[in-house]
Each structure stands twice: as C-alpha cells, then as structure tokens.
UniProtKB/Swiss-Prot annotation:
Function, in words: Involved in ribosome biogenesis; more specifically in 18S rRNA pseudouridylation and in cleavage of pre-rRNA.
Domain of life where this protein originates: Archaea
Species name: Thermococcus gammatolerans (strain DSM 15229 / JCM 11827 / EJ3)
Gene name tied to this protein: nop10
PANTHER family in the record: H_ACA RIBONUCLEOPROTEIN COMPLEX SUBUNIT 3, RIBOSOME BIOGENESIS PROTEIN NOP10
InterPro entries: H/ACA_rnp_Nop10, H/ACA_rnp_Nop10_sf, Nop10_arc-typ
Similarity comment text for this entry: Belongs to the NOP10 family.
Name used for this protein in its record: Ribosome biogenesis protein Nop10
Length: 59
C-alpha cells in the first residue's frame, strides 16, 4: 500500500487521509499525473482545454 500525500481543496492543508481532519472535506491527490511521451489521451485533453478556453487552432 502506497501512501500519497493529499490536499484539501477547501482549506489547502496537506494530509494522508481521504477526509480532511480540519474541515471534513474530501481530499485530492496532490501529485500530478505521470508524464508519458506516448500519451494516448493527450490530444483529447488538449482539444477539451482549447474548447473550454475558447482558443482557436491555427492550421
């Protein structure tokens, strides 16, 4: 079992627990996803981000 440090999105405190001991909110893993040059979903993620931010793609 690997412990990953987690962060509370409400109060910003770090903990190893799934529930924040200070405010009781559900915590999120503080580590970014692992990088891979052969990312199979990278194009979809970039396309979604462009749509959300309203960025036009040059061709």
């Amino acid at each position: 079992m690997r412990f990953r440090i987690r962060k509370c999105p409400n109060c910003g405190r770090y903990t190893l627990k799934e529930i924040c001991p200070v405010c009781g909110a559900k915590t999120k893993v503080a580590h970014p996803p692992r990088f891979s040059p052969e990312d199979p979903y990278g194009e979809y993620r970039r396309r979604w981000k462009r749509e959300v931010l309203g960025i036009e793609v040059r061709k």
